[in-house]
C-alpha cells in the first residue's frame, strides 16, 4: 500500500531553485491587470480555449476527429455518432460542469468519480465513475499508432483507500501557509496518475482535475488559454517527465520535481501566451497593423489559425482579407498554401 506525505513533499520541492523561479514568473503574470475586451469577445476566447482543451486532451489519448466533424459538433450542435465523437462531447460536458461549480465544489471522491462518469456517459453510462477492477497501465501513444508502457499503477484492490488518503492529504495541506498551492496541485496530479483509479480515461480525468484545481485555487488560466493544448504540443516531454518522476513511486523514492517543473513551465507558457493575446487586443490600431505585428513578432512561420487565435475578437473573413493584401504588397510571405497555410515576415 502506498503511503503519502504530501505536505513534506510539496514543501521540499518548493525549495528547488527552478521551481522558485517558475512560480515567481507565474505570479508576475497572474497578478497583471488588463483592460479586458467586452463580455461577448471574452466569451469567444473562453469558447476557443474550451474547445482546444477538449480536442487536445482527447488527442493525447489517440482520440481524433476531422475538423469538419469537429466544427459540426461544437458550432452546429450536431449529435455525436461515433465513440470518438461521443468522447469529445463527454469531455466537453465534464469541462462545462467544472466551470459551473468550481467556486463552491470541494475536491472529494464523489466529484472525481462524477467527472469520469460524464466522460463516459454517452458511450457506456455504467463504465464511468467506477474504480478499476483489473490492473491498468500508463501508456504513451506514438505517432505510428503503437504505444509503450510508461508505468504500472496501483493495484485495483488498493485503489479506493490510496485515493481517499491522497484526497484527504490534499485538503489538509490547503490550511498550511507553508504549502505552495501550485506545487500542491501538480504533486496531487502526479500521484493521481500513478494511482490511475479508473479502468480507462485517467489521463483525461487528470487534465480535468488540473483545470478544476487551478480554477479553484485562483488561477483562471484555463478559462482563456488551454493548458491541455500546450501539453499536447510538448507531449514527448510530458511522458518523459512523468516517467522520470514515477520511478520508485511505489517504494516512496520518486522525485516529483521533474513532473512538477514541467507542469509549472506549461502554466507559465500559457500565461505568457495569454498576456500576448490580451496585449495585442488592447492596442488601438488597425487590423492590418495588428497582423503585421503578430507575424513580425513570431520567430517561426505562423499559421492562419494562430493569427485567428490571437485576434479572437475579429472575424475570420476579415483576417483572411488582410492576409491576402499583405501577401500582394510583399510585406509577408506565404510559405504553404491551402488548409494549413503558413505565413512569415518578409525581411
Outline where the language-model segments fall.
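FIC/Doc superfamily catalytic core
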Residues: 1-347
